[in-house]
Design a protein with these regions (language model features):
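Bacterial flagellar/type III secretion structural subunits and associated motility module proteins
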Residues: 1-20, 26, 88-180
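Amphipathic alpha-helical polymerization modules
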Residues: 1-91, 122
Protein backbone atom coordinates (compact mmCIF):
# COMPACT_ATOMS: atom_id res chain seq x y z
CA UNK A 1 0.00 0.00 0.00
CA UNK A 2 2.87 2.38 0.79
CA UNK A 3 4.44 1.69 -2.62
CA UNK A 4 1.13 2.45 -4.33
CA UNK A 5 0.77 5.68 -2.33
CA UNK A 6 4.34 6.75 -3.16
CA UNK A 7 3.81 5.96 -6.83
CA UNK A 8 0.55 7.93 -6.91
CA UNK A 9 2.27 10.88 -5.23
CA UNK A 10 5.05 10.73 -7.84
CA UNK A 11 2.51 10.63 -10.67
CA UNK A 12 0.78 13.69 -9.19
CA UNK A 13 4.12 15.49 -8.85
CA UNK A 14 4.98 14.63 -12.46
CA UNK A 15 1.58 15.89 -13.65
CA UNK A 16 2.18 19.18 -11.83
CA UNK A 17 5.63 19.51 -13.43
CA UNK A 18 4.23 18.84 -16.91
CA UNK A 19 1.37 21.29 -16.36
CA UNK A 20 3.80 24.01 -15.30
CA UNK A 21 6.06 23.38 -18.30
CA UNK A 22 3.08 23.42 -20.66
CA UNK A 23 2.03 26.81 -19.28
CA UNK A 24 5.53 28.13 -20.01
CA UNK A 25 5.46 26.59 -23.49
CA UNK A 26 2.01 28.05 -24.17
CA UNK A 27 3.38 31.49 -23.34
CA UNK A 28 6.22 31.04 -25.84
CA UNK A 29 3.82 29.79 -28.52
CA UNK A 30 1.64 32.85 -27.92
CA UNK A 31 4.67 35.05 -28.53
CA UNK A 32 5.56 33.06 -31.66
CA UNK A 33 2.01 33.52 -32.91
CA UNK A 34 2.27 37.29 -32.40
CA UNK A 35 5.52 37.46 -34.40
CA UNK A 36 4.10 35.30 -37.20
CA UNK A 37 0.96 37.45 -37.32
CA UNK A 38 3.01 40.61 -37.66
CA UNK A 39 5.10 39.05 -40.43
CA UNK A 40 1.92 38.16 -42.29
CA UNK A 41 0.67 41.74 -41.84
CA UNK A 42 3.91 43.05 -43.35
CA UNK A 43 3.54 40.64 -46.24
CA UNK A 44 0.00 41.83 -46.90
CA UNK A 45 1.13 45.46 -46.78
CA UNK A 46 3.78 44.84 -49.43
CA UNK A 47 1.00 44.12 -51.91
CA UNK A 48 -0.30 47.66 -51.66
CA UNK A 49 0.42 49.92 -54.64
CA UNK A 50 1.10 52.73 -52.15
CA UNK A 51 4.16 51.09 -50.54
CA UNK A 52 7.32 52.98 -51.40
CA UNK A 53 10.87 51.64 -51.65
CA UNK A 54 11.55 53.40 -48.33
CA UNK A 55 8.62 51.54 -46.72
CA UNK A 56 9.98 48.28 -48.09
CA UNK A 57 13.34 48.98 -46.46
CA UNK A 58 11.55 49.65 -43.16
CA UNK A 59 9.64 46.37 -43.55
CA UNK A 60 12.98 44.60 -44.07
CA UNK A 61 14.40 46.19 -40.90
CA UNK A 62 11.34 45.18 -38.89
CA UNK A 63 11.37 41.63 -40.27
CA UNK A 64 15.08 41.30 -39.44
CA UNK A 65 14.32 42.33 -35.86
CA UNK A 66 11.51 39.77 -35.77
CA UNK A 67 13.92 37.06 -36.94
CA UNK A 68 16.04 37.96 -33.91
CA UNK A 69 12.97 37.68 -31.72
CA UNK A 70 12.15 34.27 -33.23
CA UNK A 71 15.74 33.18 -32.53
CA UNK A 72 15.45 34.27 -28.89
CA UNK A 73 12.14 32.44 -28.52
CA UNK A 74 13.65 29.34 -30.13
CA UNK A 75 16.33 29.37 -27.41
CA UNK A 76 13.88 30.12 -24.57
CA UNK A 77 14.49 28.22 -21.34
CA UNK A 78 11.96 27.18 -18.73
CA UNK A 79 12.06 28.06 -15.03
CA UNK A 80 14.52 25.19 -14.44
CA UNK A 81 16.91 26.42 -17.14
CA UNK A 82 16.11 23.72 -19.70
CA UNK A 83 15.56 24.65 -23.33
CA UNK A 84 11.91 24.50 -24.27
CA UNK A 85 12.86 23.51 -27.82
CA UNK A 86 16.07 21.58 -27.08
CA UNK A 87 14.53 18.12 -27.09
CA UNK A 88 16.65 15.88 -24.87
CA UNK A 89 19.70 18.18 -25.09
CA UNK A 90 19.00 19.86 -21.77
CA UNK A 91 20.39 23.23 -20.77
CA UNK A 92 22.32 24.35 -23.84
CA UNK A 93 20.85 26.69 -26.43
CA UNK A 94 19.46 24.48 -29.21
CA UNK A 95 19.82 27.07 -32.00
CA UNK A 96 23.03 28.72 -33.13
CA UNK A 97 23.54 31.78 -35.33
CA UNK A 98 26.67 31.92 -37.50
CA UNK A 99 28.46 34.99 -38.90
CA UNK A 100 26.42 34.85 -42.14
CA UNK A 101 23.12 34.96 -40.24
CA UNK A 102 22.34 31.28 -40.82
CA UNK A 103 20.55 29.56 -37.95
CA UNK A 104 21.17 25.87 -37.29
CA UNK A 105 19.71 23.44 -34.77
CA UNK A 106 22.00 21.51 -32.44
CA UNK A 107 19.35 20.20 -30.06
CA UNK A 108 17.93 16.73 -29.94
CA UNK A 109 15.14 15.65 -32.25
CA UNK A 110 13.43 13.79 -29.41
CA UNK A 111 11.01 15.07 -26.77
CA UNK A 112 11.11 14.73 -22.99
CA UNK A 113 8.16 13.12 -21.27
CA UNK A 114 7.13 12.21 -17.74
CA UNK A 115 5.00 9.32 -16.56
CA UNK A 116 1.76 10.59 -15.01
CA UNK A 117 -0.04 7.25 -14.58
CA UNK A 118 0.66 3.57 -15.10
CA UNK A 119 -0.13 3.85 -18.81
CA UNK A 120 0.41 7.53 -19.64
CA UNK A 121 3.40 9.69 -20.38
CA UNK A 122 3.02 13.40 -21.15
CA UNK A 123 5.35 15.49 -23.29
CA UNK A 124 7.38 18.16 -21.49
CA UNK A 125 8.91 19.98 -24.44
CA UNK A 126 9.25 20.10 -28.22
CA UNK A 127 12.11 19.40 -30.58
CA UNK A 128 13.05 22.75 -32.10
CA UNK A 129 13.70 21.38 -35.55
CA UNK A 130 10.04 20.32 -35.77
CA UNK A 131 8.82 23.75 -34.65
CA UNK A 132 11.18 26.04 -36.58
CA UNK A 133 13.03 24.15 -39.32
CA UNK A 134 10.89 21.34 -40.68
CA UNK A 135 7.62 23.09 -41.36
CA UNK A 136 5.78 21.17 -44.04
CA UNK A 137 3.96 22.31 -47.12
CA UNK A 138 2.29 20.16 -49.74
CA UNK A 139 5.59 19.98 -51.65
CA UNK A 140 8.46 20.25 -49.19
CA UNK A 141 9.78 21.43 -45.83
CA UNK A 142 11.07 24.88 -44.97
CA UNK A 143 12.60 26.86 -42.12
CA UNK A 144 10.76 29.79 -40.60
CA UNK A 145 14.13 31.58 -40.38
CA UNK A 146 14.77 31.06 -44.11
CA UNK A 147 11.25 32.31 -44.89
CA UNK A 148 11.96 35.55 -43.01
CA UNK A 149 15.33 35.87 -44.79
CA UNK A 150 13.57 35.45 -48.15
CA UNK A 151 11.08 38.15 -47.22
CA UNK A 152 13.85 40.54 -46.12
CA UNK A 153 15.79 39.87 -49.34
CA UNK A 154 12.70 40.60 -51.44
CA UNK A 155 12.14 43.90 -49.61
CA UNK A 156 15.63 45.03 -50.56
CA UNK A 157 14.74 45.02 -54.26
CA UNK A 158 13.27 48.29 -55.57
CA UNK A 159 9.64 48.17 -56.70
CA UNK A 160 10.52 48.09 -60.40
CA UNK A 161 12.97 45.19 -60.03
CA UNK A 162 10.37 42.63 -61.15
CA UNK A 163 11.04 40.43 -58.09
CA UNK A 164 8.42 39.58 -55.50
CA UNK A 165 8.80 37.93 -52.12
CA UNK A 166 5.84 36.05 -50.78
CA UNK A 167 6.25 35.02 -47.14
CA UNK A 168 4.30 31.93 -46.10
CA UNK A 169 2.34 31.68 -49.36
CA UNK A 170 0.81 28.21 -49.23
CA UNK A 171 2.86 27.63 -46.09
CA UNK A 172 6.13 28.44 -47.79
CA UNK A 173 8.34 31.30 -48.87
CA UNK A 174 8.90 31.78 -52.56
CA UNK A 175 10.62 34.28 -54.80
CA UNK A 176 9.22 34.95 -58.24
CA UNK A 177 11.13 36.62 -61.04
CA UNK A 178 8.82 38.07 -63.67
CA UNK A 179 9.83 38.26 -67.34
CA UNK A 180 11.10 41.68 -68.41
Amino acid sequence: AEDHKAQTMQFNKNATIVSSRMNEIDSVFDQLHNVASRLLELTAQTGSPFVSDENRKLFAIEATAMKGELFQLANQVDSKGYGIFSGLSGGRAPFELDNQGVITYSGSGANKSLQVSHNSHLRQNFAGDDVFLNLETANNKFSVFDAVDDFVDSMNFPLGAEVSGNLFSDGNSIELAFPA
